[in-house]
Amino acid sequence: MRRTMRYHVLQQSGLPHKHARATASGEDRMSNAPKNLSTIVLHAGHRADPNTGSVAVPIHQTTSFQFRDAEHAANLFALAELGNIYSRIMNPTCDVLEQRVAAMEGGAAALAVSSGQTASAYAVQNLAKAGDNIVSSTDLYGGTWNLFANTMKDMGIEVRFVDPTDPEAFRAATDDKTRAYYAETLPNPKLNVFPIAEVAAIGKDLGIPLIMDNTAAAGICRPFDHGAAVIVYSTTKYIGGHGTSIGGLIVDSGAFDWEAHPKRQPYLNEPDPSYHGAVWTQAVKGIGPVAYIIKARTTILRDLGGAMSPFNAFQFIQGLETLPLRMERHCENATAVANWLAGHPAVEAVIHPSQQSGVAKARADKYLNGGQGGLVGMVLKGGKDAGAKFIDSLEMFYHVANIGDARSLAIHPATTTHSQLSADEQEATGVSAGYVRLSIGIEHIDDIKADLEQALNKV
């Protein structure tokens, strides 16, 4: 692994600082770790480069790292010593991003990968193989739905879809081959906040970890605080924030007991033939509670190769530094847009947590802190034709497939992001013919409303 990750997980485990002196981020450490988001995203994982004193995180654009001697190399490959080997598996720039997001989420360690899709796939593949299954919420991003409904099935991993509004549906779909539960915190496009604590508690009793995609709720929800075991991110979205780079992250809480139900989690509790027969829950005990993430790094990432580039990691570090400020504006603008659209005659329905009531509102209030997200959905009265006309009439909004950009974005999911889904699958995920997804940016709210109004007037 890496010296910097060792520092982080040892500190998380309460071990003395003397065990983690040599770090790629330097020894200039603050005596008290920052506890507030706005400080964590600026300081966690890096103070100054030990060689140059650079305050900005250096881009380590290299494939390989020099070994001190033959013994050092052998120890690294045997996990007897932590350090950098090859940038497909670990890189000092990526390491800072990993430490920073792990600290942001209150987790033990993280793994940077090439995209959000890679993060979702690896998070599952780290626990499930052919013949196994996971239980997933139906409320998913279209790309994740396709991954689970088709590609995972081709790999022999069954994904059982259940209604996320009923936590007990996860228990009902579970059998002795169920390895994980999966859901999105603020699912796109329905935007109904997932009952994290309820499903996590069910999973804990059964030895099943809850994997949460927190992409749309970065900075406003901490799933680990509610019992989730693993978080995945598309860093492409709000963490990056400027539409410049593709990337993903897997974050390990370090709190899930993988040994409590060894038959439920065999790939962490039985010898792994791909790594000298290592039993992961035992092999990493001297490092910290990071069996899940170390296995993901040293087997799944090693073999499938979906690594994040150091340059992209640098871009995400830059974005992360302003995440709290941007999310405040995203959320403020999105709520204002949702309230305004609710009174527009061309709009049949508005989808946003601010417009919800009952259980859905209670969950949004419980799990979202500091805002209700930057996404707004609306259903236009004219259906598909109205959706197309509206999209084509926008002037300031960009018509793109991304979300979480500083700029305002719009798309018609039924004919784009969810077009590979059947009509029934589209309905299950919350996409209707007239549904338009808006990713509200950080522009002035008056300019956002003006562009929406002129486009709606043409529908």
Predicted regions and their residues:
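N-terminal glycine-rich, Lys/His-bearing helix-loop that initiates the first secondary-structure elements
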Residues: 26-84
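Conserved PLP-enzyme active-site core in the AAT-like
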Residues: 31, 41-43, 47-50, 109-343
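PLP-dependent enzyme catalytic core of the Aspartate aminotransferase-like
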Residues: 17-21, 26-29, 149-150, 158, ...
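Glycine-rich beta-alpha junction loops
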Residues: 46-48, 61-67, 237, 254-255, ...
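Conserved C-terminal alpha-helix-loop-beta "cap" of PLP-dependent enzymes
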Residues: 327, 335, 341-342, 346-436, ...
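Conserved N-terminal alpha-helix of the aminotransferase class I/II PLP-enzyme fold
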Residues: 64, 69-121, 143-151
